[in-house]
Amino acid sequence: MVLAQLGGSISRALAQMSNATVIDEKVLGECLNEISRALLQSDVQFKMVRDMQTNIRKIVNLETLAAGTNKRRIIQQAVFTELCNMLDPGKPAFTPKKGKPSVVMFVGLQGSGKTTTCTKYAYYHQRKGFKPSLVCADTFRAGAFDQLKQNATKAKIPFYGSYMESDPVKIAVEGLERFRKENSDLIIIDTSGRHKQEAALFEEMRQVAEATKPDLVIFVMDGSIGQAAFDQAQAFKQSASVGAVIITKLDGHAKGGGALSAVAATKSPVIFIGTGEHIDEFEIFDVKPFVSRLLGMGDLSGLMDKIQDVMPADQQPELLAKLAEGTFTLRLLYEQFQNLLKMGPIGQVFSMLPGFSSELMPKGHEKEGQAKIKRYMTIMDSMTAAELDSTNPKLMTESRIIRIARGSGRQIRDVTDMLEEYKRLAKMWSKMKGLKMPKNGKMSDLSQNLNIQQMTKALPPQVLKQMGGMGGLQALMKQMGGKDMSKMLGGMGLGGD
């Protein structure tokens, strides 16, 4: 059971509970048993699952709830809160600051994906405006420097290593000195891994750490080991002063939930998760938005950040103005498709859209979804400027549709499908009319200005129902931090699959 399946199973359990005519002990018990079964299949420790059930039952005491209380909403909120508690170590990790030199050392067992993760970490920060660099102090594994060199070259990140020197401490110090002179503000040191935890590995890590004095030591762990992650994370934390954890290989293994919860139990913060082999299949891990996306409710503040990353700053005010007007043209859709294809794995992006993850992209078929978007763009390439800029749906007559289909080499059905998708998105866009725009014109600040009425209009009816209507949304806002809308949006996941 991969994480998407885990989220689907929990969402279905909540949906079945919401659809019940009467919420009684039997319905609550069935819902909690389904959720517990899904968590156990994801290799979450039995004790953690049992404690979660106990805590939810303490919150949701059906006998003592006042008449007229929305039981569905209370159960959903309790499940959301307990899932967050299960994955939250309650301790923040060191965060590099742009322009201020930081040294980060990576440690982990061989085969965990440590070297690849070093490059992903560097690439992520490079896109955020940092000047990262990579140092290969792994002299144990044959080919380690070649791998780092290849990855770094592809990502256009400066690197340092040696084919001749066998002392990892000397290489680490030389690399550190070189990149400090070059004003790198994030120096990442990759260290040797072993097939198992052993004294020699920990001693080497200690020596490299002593010589380089890293601001943060990151432990890279294979997520497929499930709850065994607890012992591994604990051992590294005690021996290597680990300040944060990155969990890899969460894209196709059954035990990801177990690994995440086990690491949280050691009070070690998970800061990123690896969801594939490609350099952009790497996500920042923030508990509330993660649980929100897991349950199909999206992460709008995260989506705004992604849009800001790929959209030039001078285009953002123009897009926000169009959003405030509620005007959505085919040209605007085309531009957003272009941005969407730059944002990284399409499944990751769609999981941030509340209730819309399956509309454009069939579940688990990212390539099909990407191909569909490119097909739609090809169709729009055969449209006139008047057609692209029009907001009048009656403009698309049968003769125009036939002409567009011929010009793009597509079937008439493909053109009508694209137009239906456009109408659906335009309808959703129009509901945001009148939105107060951020004064600085930044997309990332937009989520703070969304009010309850606009959110209620924009959310699909079935998703809003899962949340308990407007009242549920308001209660959740309060739970997620009150006035800060971005925090609330980052973690409002309580519904549909």
From Swiss-Prot:
Region (G-domain) residue spans: 1-295
Classification via Pfam families: SRP54 (PF00448), SRP54_N (PF02881), SRP_SPB (PF02978)
UniProt free text on domains: The NG domain, also named G domain, is a special guanosine triphosphatase (GTPase) domain, which binds GTP and forms a guanosine 5'-triphosphate (GTP)-dependent complex with a homologous NG domain in the SRP receptor subunit SRPRA. The two NG domains undergo cooperative rearrangements upon their assembly, which culminate in the reciprocal activation of the GTPase activity of one another. SRP receptor compaction upon binding with cargo-loaded SRP and GTPase rearrangement drive SRP-mediated cotranslational protein translocation into the ER.
Molecular function, one GO term: 7S RNA binding
Disulfide bonds: none
Family: Belongs to the GTP-binding SRP family. SRP54 subfamily.
Amino-acid positions noted as binding GTP in the UniProt annotation, renumbered to this chain: 108-115, 190-194, 248-251
Organism: Hordeum vulgare (Barley)
Entry's localization field: Cytoplasm; Endoplasmic reticulum
Gene: SRP54-2
GO biological process assignments: SRP-dependent cotranslational protein targeting to membrane, translocation
EC numbers for this chain: 3.6.5.4
Keywords: Cytoplasm, Endoplasmic reticulum, GTP-binding, Hydrolase, Nucleotide-binding, Ribonucleoprotein, RNA-binding, Signal recognition particle
Protein name per its UniProtKB record: Signal recognition particle subunit SRP54 2
Reaction it catalyzes: GTP + H2O = GDP + phosphate + H(+)
Enzyme kind, highest EC tier: hydrolase
A GO-annotated cellular component: cytosol
Keyword Cytoplasm listed: yes
Region (M-domain) location: 296-497
UniProt function note: Component of the signal recognition particle (SRP) complex, a ribonucleoprotein complex that mediates the cotranslational targeting of secretory and membrane proteins to the endoplasmic reticulum (ER). As part of the SRP complex, associates with the SRP receptor (SR) component SRPRA to target secretory proteins to the endoplasmic reticulum membrane. Binds to the signal sequence of presecretory proteins when they emerge from the ribosomes. Displays basal GTPase activity, and stimulates reciprocal GTPase activation of the SR subunit SRPRA.
Highest taxon, organism lineage: Eukaryota
CDD domains: SRP54_G
Complex formation: Component of a signal recognition particle (SRP) complex that consists of a 7SL RNA molecule of 300 nucleotides and six protein subunits: SRP72, SRP68, SRP54, SRP19, SRP14 and SRP9.
